[in-house]
């Protein structure tokens, strides 16, 4: 493969059977036939080919095509999900806001309030929202996604002992610009998932996330902060180049989003 993946996402075969080839093309020799419901882990991919991935099956390595011949129907299901991205809106004055979400590498699953070709809300400076569809009140817009196929960048980040997770998140989220309330809601959601692990390899994603989960907001915000954490649990610590994080300055109409995903490995 052009790029080897150390912490690749898990997937299961959903086609009746899936051929594994010795190269990323059907002209190569078939190395194995993988039955339906088999659990696999992505080990690598080609930079210029989104249809083939490199996997291991029963000690053999090879390539599988993750789409049928129509290039739309998938042969596998990815188990990684985008968990609880929430969107806060802070206009300078009462404002009608339209928010659209475009997912190119995952499938929209649950939304609240209900997403109907976007969200239409009246937003207030304190962050409170009124959903125009039914008049319900909210603190944020919630969404999550399944079958996430995004290849997140795990080359830089932080290896953190599970027992140090709370301290780490408080420090980094404050530095990146979350308010105490936003930070507390982030930590309350993620801490129970992470602190019992021996270690966590933690990254905060940039373009890999923002380009695959695009936000279109009308009116356009003056400042936008999108924090998306991706982590994987480890039994032992690893050395990794520390990630340089950016700070965030709030000005004018401000939008803040946070969420995350765990790369689970069998």
Regions found by a protein language model. Name each.
Residues 1, 32-69:
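SH3/SH3-like beta-barrel superfamily modules
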Residues 2-9, 68-78:
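Intrinsically disordered, low-complexity Ser/Thr-rich linker and spacer segments
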Residues 77-266:
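Protease-labile, long low-complexity intrinsically disordered regions enriched in Pro/Ser/Thr
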Residues 11-13, 33, 48, 80-84, ...:
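Short, surface-exposed loop/turn motifs at beta-strand boundaries within globular domains
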Residues 18, 38, 53, 85-87, ...:
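Residue-level detector of short, conserved catalytic/binding motifs and their immediate flanks
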Residues 19-23:
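Core beta-strand residues in small-molecule sensory/regulatory alpha/beta domains
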Residues 24-29:
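Short alpha-helix capping/helix-loop boundary micro-motifs
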